Structure formats: structure tokens, C-alpha cells
Amino acid sequence: MNNMSLKFPDIAINSSESSDDEDPSSKNEKKDGSIKVVKGLTDEKKVFEKAKNDFDEALAIIDDDDFEYTKSEDDKVRRKIDFFILPIMCITYGMQYLDKTAVSYAAVYGMKQEAHLSGYVYSWLSTIFYLGYMIAQYPAGYLLQKFPISYFMFIAAFLWSACVLLMAACSNRHGLLTLRFFSGVFEGCVNPAFVALTAMWYKREEQPVRVVSWYAFNGVAIMVGALLGYGTGHIKGSLQNWKYPFLVIGAISTAWSFVYLFFPQNPVLARFLNAREKRIAVERVRKNRTGMETKKFKPSQALEAFKDPQVILIVLYNGLCQVTNAMSVFSALIIQGIGYSGINATLLTLPSGAFAVAGMIASGIFTHYFKKGRIPLAMTTSSLTIVGSIMIWKIPHSNPWPRVVGVWLFCTISSGNAVILSLLSSNISGYSKKVTVNATMFLFYSIGNIVSPQLFKAGQTPEYIEGIQASLVSVCLFEGVLALLAFYYIFENARRDKLLENNPALGGEIKNEEFLDKTDREQIKFRYVW
């Protein structure tokens, strides 16, 4: 690893040491509970002019005076952010998951037969969605950096909802495949945007719980979708039954998209915060050393992303993890194949969501009380997916209920994925690097999801055992990748501690370094959480 050199600042004054457990900026917290912020850059006008280009937009409200705020003020701002920002993210994440899995409910009500979808074409409904998702990643990352996130999300949410609605008007595979492709393009904007939002609004130690919170709405969506699917199956209207899930879910999503017209672009522009609270919101994320938002794209940071070992391991993990994701589309069909009717099979997917949400809650509690151990936690929750896979595969057909429970256990994989996703917001610094890593991460997410449904072939019906076996192999492989990632973080933190111990001058104070849009590899004081 000697060729993985770090670029550290040449300027060093007031040298100080840093450890894996303490960020140097934490020394600003005083005994009376107030928090003192060091002075800003002295050439204020030049900084404000460059904030819109080279540096972070947070500098626009950081003046040259000492700024202090109390712990109670910090908590008040956090509660406001939780009240105004987090629910919108949670519901949106649930809606996008509900939208993309609507085909699962339509399938058990005759869509495959009435729209003339052979087994391989149905698999392509999932594959082509993620082809669109993959194509969208780098353009979405670029647009996310250039335009207000509120309008970006409104347009994306409105257009993917429209695609879901229009699927009810289709009568053949060509229309369905086309709309699934464009639905994937627009839904592909959500994950990169939400990772960026989490890093923008929350402290590093707060991020895992918030990522788990909005990611948990995948599980909520599974439960809501099961009820909607069950309900729409009883509609006696003039349309074919399989079209109603698209109409109901698409209409709800379209209405929800308009919420983003009122969504703040960043803490500096948040209307629900007063001037002092905006400054506190900015200072809250100073210790993260990951910045807030910068509009200028920096190619050097993008290049660094492709050379960073942690990025390589994270994207490899994500690709392997998503190989298991076809279960979201095939779960109702697998349960139907175990021996339950279409309507009952749809209803029996509801506990899958409950298991996923329970896993998320447990993960959130763990990360709240234990500041380290995100990767071991993800490895532990993923082991439940291994158990579920073996139950579906090995338990005799004469014993259907344990096999259904295996399907439910399989879905706990999402809680581990959410925990690893929080590493993106915590361990990647430099805004251009961040959007590049997010795009690359979800490009591999797309590749895994493109491969996944092709492993569930028509010849495997009704139980898709070979697809389950392939998923099992994938989980075992990414467990190994996670072990390597944990080792890398521990090694790199120790190496930086040693560098500071041997060269104390490297730890010198650089005013507002946290908002100078430096990458994690350019900051010797940066420590990786694992």
C-alpha cells in the first residue's frame, strides 16, 4: 500500500495530534457545554466570492468572529432538521421502492399472461429498469452538483411517477419495457441525492441512524405494497386487475413529488431555520470534515475516487449485494410457487417488510450506542440472509411455512446495506469526489441488479432455486469484501496516527479547513469510521 500516498497541506501552524477516537475540532467543546468555533479565513470577501466555486457554500455564512452555541441549541437544530428533512426523505425512499416493485403485484394478477410476457421478458422488466438506472448515474451526479437539489428531486420524482402511471395504459411488452427503462433513469437519481443530503445535514455520528431510517422505508413500502396489492386485487372495475397497482401507486407518487418544490437546497438556504440556527447547522457538520456543498466540479477529485482502495471495495460490495435484489420482484412469485394463491402470496410478502424494518431498527439502535462496528454489524445481519437462502433451498416442499419464513429472513439483507451506505456520507470528503463515488457506487448497484433477475430464469419456476443459490454465493463473497474493507480502515487510521506522531507539524491548524473542499486523502486529520 506504499503507492497509495496521501496529499497533505504544506501549511502547518499550531501543531496538534489526532487519534482514531477524537477529531481535533472536538477540542472546541467547553466545560460549560457551549461549543466554540475557531475564527474563519481572514480575507472574507475573497472567500465569499470563491465559496460559490472552489470552496464550500457553508463559507457564505461563516464570518471572521468567534461563534459559540450551546448543546441545547445544537439539539434544537437537530430536532428541526429531523422534523422538516428526514420525513420527506423517508417517504420518498419508500415511494420509489413501491413504484419499482409494482410489477411484482401486477404479475400475480395476470400481467404476464395478458401482456404476453414470457418468463424471460418478465425478468427483463427488472433488468431494463436497472439499465436505465445505470445510465443515469454519472449525469445525475453532475446535475446534482450543478442545480438546486429541490428542483432536481421534484423533476425526478414527478417523471418516475408518471412512468408508473402510464404502465397501466400498456397492453404489450414493448410499452412496459420502455416505461420501465425510463422509470429506472429517473429513480436512479434518488440514492446519490440522499447520500449527499445526509452528509450535508447531519453529524457523522448521527448519519447511520438517519440512513437506516430512510432506508427502512423500503421495508415499510413492502408492507404497504402488500396491502395495496391485496386491496387492488379485489377491485371489480372495467380495467384488467393487473393495471390497478400501477394506477394507485403511480397516483400517490405523483402527488407526493410536489413536496420537493418546498424542499431547502442546503442549510444556508433553509427557511425553517433562522439566521443563528443556519450558522449552527453549518457548524454542526464541521467536525465531519466532509464539507457541505460545492458547485464547481473538480476533475482531480473524481480521479482520486477511482484510485481510492475504500471506493473500490465499497462498489464491489454493492455490486455483489444487489445480485440478491431480484427477490423484491420475484418474492410474490416464489411464495406462490411454494403453494399459495396469487392474492394470498401478495399478502404473505408483508412480513418481508416487517423483517426488513426490524433489522433496520436493530441496526439503528446499535449504531446509536456503538460508534464503531458498522461493518461487523452489516456482516452479522447479512448472515441472516444466508440462513434464509438455505431454508428456501433445503427445507422439503412438504413443509411450506418454514420456506416462507426463509423468504422473510432473506429480506433482512437491506439493513446491512443501509449501514454500509452510511459509510459513503461519513468517509468520503470533497464534494466532486463524493458525487463521483456515489455515481460509481450506484452504477455497480445497477450492474448487480441487471445481473440479478437473469439468474431467476423461466425454467426455474415455480420456486427459482438456482436464483436463490446464486444469491447465496453472492452474499458469501461480499462478506469477504467487507472484512477487507474493515481491515483497510483500521490500517489507514493507524498509519495516519503514526504519521502525526512522527511529524507533529503535519497536524497544524488551517482555518476552516473543514470547508475548503478537501478530500479525505488530503486531510491527515481525517479518520475513517468502520
From Swiss-Prot:
Signal peptide: none annotated. It is a multi-pass membrane protein. Pfam families: MFS_1. The keyword Acetylation does not apply. Keywords: Endoplasmic reticulum, Membrane, Transmembrane, Transmembrane helix, Transport. One of its GO terms (biological process) is transmembrane transport. SUPFAM superfamilies: MFS general substrate transporter. PROSITE patterns: MFS. Residues 1-33 are annotated as: Disordered. It is found in: Endoplasmic reticulum; Membrane. The chain crosses the membrane at residues 83-103, 124-144, 147-167, 181-201, 211-231, 244-264, 323-343, 346-366, 375-395, 404-424, 436-456, 471-491. Its main location: endoplasmic reticulum. Residues 24-33 have a biased composition (Basic and acidic residues). GO terms for cellular component: endoplasmic reticulum; membrane. Belongs to the major facilitator superfamily. Allantoate permease family. This is Uncharacterized transporter C460.05. The lineage of its organism: Eukaryota, Fungi, Dikarya, Ascomycota, Taphrinomycotina.
